[in-house]
């Protein structure tokens, strides 16, 4: 896939479809051009189920530590990687591998983590942020995190987090201030 920077309408030619992130505004010149040309446009949130549906997804969410945790996981698990920061191990935020495994940094900012189909869900913490997406409603925010965890077969949580510690889910509970050897 060719990446063209900066954004320009000339980049939109005859693509089958366009995928855009939550950071892209509706008036983005490429998104506007794609719509003018009748090209289907999908948000990252909408396309995730199709990208991850047949994969064994190792998903990491949380307000802090997602990229670090995801990069560490990516060094341990053979497979594709989609994370938020550049991995020092492979020099990119993405790695493709012919494997069913995908290490995925799950995004709670737009609740797209609910579309990530996790086999394993790790939540480093559930500190309230991006509250505008949740209508400034803590119950909605926490329900999204709980929903993310409920979708996974295996769950790992920070048992010292104020919210996560209250969940009545079967999960590996880590206590980072004292002991992380329970994995």
Predicted segments, located by residue:
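Long, basic/Gly/Ser/Thr-rich N-terminal segments
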Residues: 1-4, 8
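Phosphate-binding loop of NTP-binding sites
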Residues: 10-14, 22-173, 181-183
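Cytosolic ligand/metal-binding cores
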Residues: 18
């Amino acid at each position: 896939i060719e990446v063209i920077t900066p954004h320009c309408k000339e980049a939109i030619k005859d693509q089958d479809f366009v995928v855009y992130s939550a950071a892209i505004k509706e008036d983005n010149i490429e998104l506007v051009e794609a719509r003018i040309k009748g090209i289907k446009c999908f948000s990252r949130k909408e396309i995730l189920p199709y990208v991850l549906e047949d994969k064994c997804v190792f998903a990491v969410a949380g307000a802090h530590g997602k990229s670090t945790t995801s990069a560490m996981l990516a060094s341990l698990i053979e497979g594709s990687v989609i994370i938020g920061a550049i991995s020092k191990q492979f020099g990119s935020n993405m790695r493709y591998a012919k494997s069913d495994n995908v290490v995925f940094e799950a995004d709670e900012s737009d609740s797209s983590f609910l579309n990530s189909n996790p086999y394993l869900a790790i939540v480093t913490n559930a500190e309230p942020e991006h509250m505008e997406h949740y209508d400034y409603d803590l119950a909605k925010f926490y329900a999204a995190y709980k929903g993310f965890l409920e979708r996974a077969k295996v769950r790992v949580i920070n048992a010292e987090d104020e919210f996560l510690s209250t969940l009545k889910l079967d999960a590996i509970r880590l206590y980072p201030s004292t002991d992380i050897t329970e994995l």
